[in-house]
């Protein structure tokens, strides 16, 4: 080290320590110096490990953003920011009137802002699951749509129709008219409030193409919907807004707070067009509110028919 300084070389103090430590270890353990990797090799190995770690983190991030993941038979992960969605929801842990099973799920994204707003789950009452194949039977499908592909199976034709912009609205409407009870679970991915949730529902319903033909009924129903939001204030992310479409077409709204571990009734909407238009927007049209939800719903219904 003295000779190096005498030549005017600038050597980092940390490197002197490494040299001194290696020399001392050689004497202690009786090793030859050639068995110790040069410091450049150590740095290269460290850099390689660091890059590998970054790659693994990136890979994990890509996996987490890939879309809904089925964790097990009892729940599905819709988005990593919120709790997994339970496949079966029923009283008394909720204020639902009966037991429901999850058929479709996915995030609701605001495209022009580029972020996810909430996780959505579409459920059907367990007692009404047998109604789906009865309503969407081959005879009905052929009468409703003359262009049914004879080369495909019945389930394939149903799946294709549920993904079609026009046919999907017809099928969802037929299920609702046939008495199938639906339920939507909305779980905010970001902190929000009841006013934003209410305004989002109103906007979605007003965007339904049949609204203009039913202005009086829709106007009356939207006022009922606004009145149903009896609770005000903030809604933390991961809480649940539960919208149950009952057999008579009315909507029952309830709220579940995870922090307080309680459910509370919000209100109800008696005008049947409001519920029908809302669930049609979730599952039908050329721009459904959550395309992944419609996709998973269509895949599940295919297995039922």
Curated annotation (Swiss-Prot):
Give start-end ranges for the coiled-coil region(s).
none
Q: Where in the cell is it found?
A: Mitochondrion
Q: Is Transit peptide among the key words of this record?
A: yes
Q: Which UniProt keywords apply?
A: Mitochondrion, Transit peptide
A single Gene Ontology CC annotation of this entry is:
mitochondrion
Q: Does the keyword Transit peptide apply?
A: yes
Q: Which GO terms describe its molecular function?
A: intramolecular lyase activity
Which superkingdom does the taxonomy of this entry point to?
Eukaryota
Q: Where is the transit peptide, renumbered to this chain?
A: 1-22
Please state which protein family the record places this protein in.
Answer: Belongs to the AIM18/AIM46 family.
What PANTHER family does its record include?
A: FATTY-ACID-BINDING PROTEIN 2 (PTHR47284:SF3)
Query: What's the protein name?
Result: Altered inheritance of mitochondria protein 18, mitochondrial
Gene assigned in the entry:
AIM18
């Amino acid at each position: 080290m003295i000779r190096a300084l005498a030549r005017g070389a600038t050597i980092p103090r940390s490197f002197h320590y490494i040299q001194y430590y290696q020399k001392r270890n050689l004497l202690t353990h009786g090793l030859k110096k050639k068995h110790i990797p040069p410091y450049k090799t150590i740095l290269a190995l460290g850099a390689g490990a660091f890059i590998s770690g970054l790659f693994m983190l990136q890979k994990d991030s890509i996996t987490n953003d890939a879309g809904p993941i089925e964790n097990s038979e009892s729940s599905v992960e819709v988005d990593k920011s919120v709790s997994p969605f339970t496949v079966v929801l029923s009283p008394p842990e909720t204020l639902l009137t009966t037991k429901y099973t999850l058929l479709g799920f996915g995030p609701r994204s605001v495209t022009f802002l580029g972020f996810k707003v909430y996780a959505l789950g579409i459920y059907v009452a367990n007692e009404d699951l047998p109604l789906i194949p009865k309503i969407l039977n081959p005879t009905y499908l052929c009468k409703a749509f003359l262009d049914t592909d004879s080369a495909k199976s019945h389930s394939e034709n149903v799946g294709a129709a549920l993904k079609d912009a026009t046919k999907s609205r017809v099928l969802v409407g037929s299920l609702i008219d046939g008495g199938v009870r639906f339920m939507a679970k909305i779980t905010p991915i970001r902190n929000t409030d009841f006013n934003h949730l209410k305004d989002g529902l109103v906007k979605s319903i007003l965007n339904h193409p049949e609204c203009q033909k039913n202005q009086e009924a829709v106007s009356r129903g939207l006022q009922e919907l606004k009145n149903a939001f009896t609770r005000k204030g903030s809604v933390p992310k991961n809480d649940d807004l539960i919208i149950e479409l009952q057999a008579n077409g009315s909507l029952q709204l309830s709220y579940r707070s995870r922090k307080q571990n309680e459910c509370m009734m919000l209100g109800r909407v008696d005008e049947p067009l409001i519920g029908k238009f809302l669930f049609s927007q979730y599952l039908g049209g050329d721009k459904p509110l959550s395309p992944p939800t419609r996709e998973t719903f269509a895949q599940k219904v295919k297995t039922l028919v």
